[in-house]
């Protein structure tokens, strides 16, 4: 079985802590002994800022942030902000009850992270 969610429109985030990515939430079913493979695909993000900008991406499971995260930063403060495709893949064991998976993101070093093309969250189990 597979589940899928996708963003629409332009989204931005300037928080230094993880906040939910609008539209990227799934509820995976119960199923002890099975692992769901969760993929967060952010194909064209970029970050703006004055101190080597970048972004971090992760997922929460029932509100708790997974320790597995993906991130990008530029090598220095760029004169123009290029796209940095970022993908996170994490295994989440199914439990005795359904679990909510929410994509989260944050800027690093005071930067603003922007996506203006669809990002997706999927689960296969």
Residue spans for each PLM region:
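Extracellular receptor-binding modules and their adjoining Ser/Thr/Gly/Asp/Asn-rich linkers
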Residues: 1-3
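Terminal beta-strand-rich extracellular "head" domains
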Residues: 6-15, 28-125
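Local beta-strand/beta-hairpin segments that build beta-sheet-rich folds
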Residues: 19-23, 66
């Amino acid at each position: 079985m597979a589940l899928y969610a996708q963003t629409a429109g332009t989204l931005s985030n300037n928080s230094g802590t993880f906040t939910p990515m609008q539209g990227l939430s799934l509820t995976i079913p119960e199923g002890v002994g099975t692992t769901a493979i969760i993929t967060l695909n952010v194909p064209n993000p970029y970050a703006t800022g004055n101190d080597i900008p970048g972004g971090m991406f992760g997922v929460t499971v029932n509100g708790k942030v997974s320790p597995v995260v993906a991130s990008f930063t530029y090598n220095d403060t760029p004169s123009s902000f290029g796209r940095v495709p970022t993908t996170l893949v994490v295994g989440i064991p199914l439990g005795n009850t359904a679990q909510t998976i929410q994509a989260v993101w944050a800027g690093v070093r005071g930067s603003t992270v922007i996506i203006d093309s669809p990002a997706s969250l999927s689960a296969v189990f």
